[in-house]
Amino acid sequence: MDIRAAEISAILKNQIKNFGQDAEVSEVGQVLSVGDGIARVYGLDNVQAGEMVEFPGGIRGMALNLESDNVGVVIFGSDRDIKEGDTVKRTGAIVEVPVGPELLGRVVDALGNPIDGKGPINSAIRSRVDVKAPGIIPRKGVHEPMSTGIKAIDALIPVGRGQRELVIGDRQTGKTAIILDTFLNQKPAHDAGGDDKMFCVYVAIGQKRSTVAQFVKVLEERGALKYSIIIAATASDPAPMQYLAPFAGCTMGEYFRDKGQHALIAYDDLSKQAVAYRQMSLLLRRPPGREAYPGDVFYLHSRLLERAAKLSDERGAGSLTALPVIETQGNDVSAFIPTNVISITDGQIFLETDLFYQGIRPAVNVGLSVSRVGSAAQIKAMKQVAGSIKGELAQYREMAAFAQFGSDLDAATQRLLNRGARLTELLKQPQFSPLKVEEQVVVIFAGVNGYLDKLAVSDVGRFEHGVLSYLRTEGKDILDAIRTEKAISDDVKGKLKAALDTFAKSFA
C-alpha cells in the first residue's frame, strides 16, 4: 500500500487553512410546562412579541406573553408531542405567510401550508401576517362599485371597493350564501380579462370541514376557484390557528391591493375568531373583561379590518374590500362582539331568520341594513332607479304594520301596499344566480315604474325572468347602452319603456 505523505499533509493543511471559525449562535429555551395549546418557556431572553419559535419535531409556535421569568407561547399544532424540558429555538422571524398569484386556486391553512393535496406552493414572496394598516394620506375615498350580483344589496345597500361591509345574522340565515354569490359574480370580469377584476380570498374560521369542502366544490364547479384563495382554520384546528387565519388571509389579499389590483376578502366568521382569542388569552392568564373577552378584543378586530382600504392614485389605486361575518344569538345585535364590529365597519347587512322562513331570500332586512358609503359606490343608472325604491319600501313597511289593524284602507294606501308587496317579491333571488348590473337596473326600473302593479304577486318572478330573456335577445342594445354609459339617458329610457310595454302586452 502506497502512502503519499506529501499529498496527505497538503490535504490536512488545506482543511486547517479553510476551517470556518464563524460558529452559529441560536438562542434556545426550555419548556417549563405545556397544556391546552400553551407552552411556558424559560430562556429565549431576546425573543420578540409575535415571533415564530420552533419546538422539536418541526412544530411551530408564536411568542405572545413576554413575562419577567418566562415566555408564553401559543402552539400552532398538537401539544401532545411537546413535553417538559424540550428545547425551543428562536427563528428570528415574526410570523410570515407566502403571498402572490401562486396561491390562487389553492386551499391553505393559517400558516400558508397547502391542505388540498395539489402539491407545494412555489411562492417566492413571504409577507408578515400582522402589519400596520395604511395611514390617512395613502388612502382615497371609496367611489367604485363592488358588484355582488344580488339585487337587494346592489340597489339598497351598495358596497364599494375598499369598504368594510358587515354581514350579520343568526345561524342558517344565508350569510355564507351571500359571500358565495359575490365571489361567483366576479367571474364575468375575470373572463373578460379587464383591469377591474377582483381576486377573492375566503377565510373559514372554526367551521366544519365538510362545509369548507362544499364551499370549495361549488367554486370549482362554477369556475370561480381559479381567482380565489381559501384559508381554512376549521373547528378541529387549535385556537391559535383560528386566531391567525384572518390575519394570514388579509396579508394574501393585501398583496393584490398593493400591486394596484383589486381584492375581496370574506372572514367567515369573526365571532369564532374572538372565541379562539378569548380561549388563548384566558389560558395565558390575561385579565378577562366583558363576557370574559380580553380587553383588547376590539383592537383585535379593528386592526384587522382597518387593513381593508382603497389606496390613492400615487399608491397604485388598488383596493381591498372586506366582508366580515358575525353570527348573532337569537337576533341579539347588542352583544359585545356584534356591537364592536358594527362600530368598526362601514355599514352592515342584517339577515333575519323570520324573513328567511317567510321565503324572502336573501333574507336581508332592508330597514336595518345600511351602507355608510352609500350611493358613492353605485353607477348613475342604479342611483336613478334605486333612489325611489328605498323610499317606497320604507313607506310600505310602515303602512304594513298599521294595515294589520284596519280593514277599510283608502285607495292610495292600498296602492302603496300593493306596490310594496311586489317590490319585496322583486328583490327575492335564488342562490347561484347573480345578475349583471345592467340587468338589475332594468328589473328595478320595471318595478318602480308600475309594470308589476297589475300582476299577481306570484307572477312577479316569472315576469322578471321573461323580461330579462326578452331583453337579452330583442333589447341587447338597451343593456349594452346601460353597461357602457353607466346611466339611463332619455333615449335609452324611451327605448326601455317601449320594450317593457311590448313585453307586458305579450305576458300572460
Curated annotation (Swiss-Prot):
Naturally occurring in which organism (per UniProt): Allorhizobium ampelinum (strain ATCC BAA-846 / DSM 112012 / S4)
Catalytic activity line of the entry: ATP + H2O + 4 H(+)(in) = ADP + phosphate + 5 H(+)(out)
Protein name, as recorded: ATP synthase subunit alpha
Protein keywords: ATP synthesis, ATP-binding, Cell inner membrane, Cell membrane, CF(1), Hydrogen ion transport, Ion transport, Membrane, Nucleotide-binding, Translocase, Transport
Bilayer topology: Peripheral membrane protein
Claim: Disulfide bond is one of the keywords in the record: no
UniProt GO molecular function: ADP binding; ATP binding; proton-transporting ATP synthase activity, rotational mechanism
EC number: 7.1.2.2
Classification lineage: Bacteria, Pseudomonadati, Pseudomonadota, Alphaproteobacteria, Hyphomicrobiales
Record carries keyword Acyltransferase: no
Entry-linked NCBIfam families: atpA (TIGR00962), PRK13343.1 (NF009884)
Record GO cellular component, one term: plasma membrane
